[in-house]
A protein has these predicted regions:
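N-terminal secretory leader/proregion of peptide precursors and effectors
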Residues: 1-17
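Secreted/periplasmic proteins
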Residues: 17-133
Length: 133
């Protein structure tokens, strides 16, 4: 008999590529009050690629950019949007406005209004197709 593999194990075995073509990443938040890693540019609302805005901006690590087949130059000039697919349903559509440190695959959601305890620790991200309203 064959053993059944759940979705999370399948994503892990495929190198982090989900069945929807997205990439599994760690989901973190930045820019909230008392953020222990807040820097002066974030405090001013400045991202590496564009100004930061609530309900719009995210920061990606270089490894997440590479997994999505993006370069820093592409992000600077094209201002791509991503879809963050949350476990259990729901999608956040956000623009890449900043860089996140560290080497792991991670999306850092800009939350100046406060830390959002309802967001999960992991999500699947993909490039957004189509226009953004």
């Amino acid at each position: 008999m064959f053993e059944t593999i759940n979705d999370e194990d399948l994503v892990r075995a495929s190198g982090g590529v989900a069945s929807n073509g997205g990439v599994q990443v760690r989901l973190t938040q930045f820019g909230y009050r008392n953020d222990p890693y807040m820097d002066s540019e974030t405090r001013k609302g400045h991202g590496a690629y564009s100004n930061l805005a609530s309900n719009r901006s995210v920061a990606l690590t270089d490894s997440t950019l590479a997994a999505l087949h993006l370069t820093k130059s592409m992000v600077r000039h094209e201002h791509p949007w991503i879809d963050i697919h949350l476990k259990g349903g729901g999608v956040l559509t956000r623009r890449i406005d900043d860089r996140a440190p560290e080497r792991n695959r991670r999306v850092d959601v800009y939350e100046p209004g406060g830390f959002n305890r309802q967001l999960p620790d992991y999500a699947t991200v993909s490039l957004h197709r189509g226009s953004v309203a």
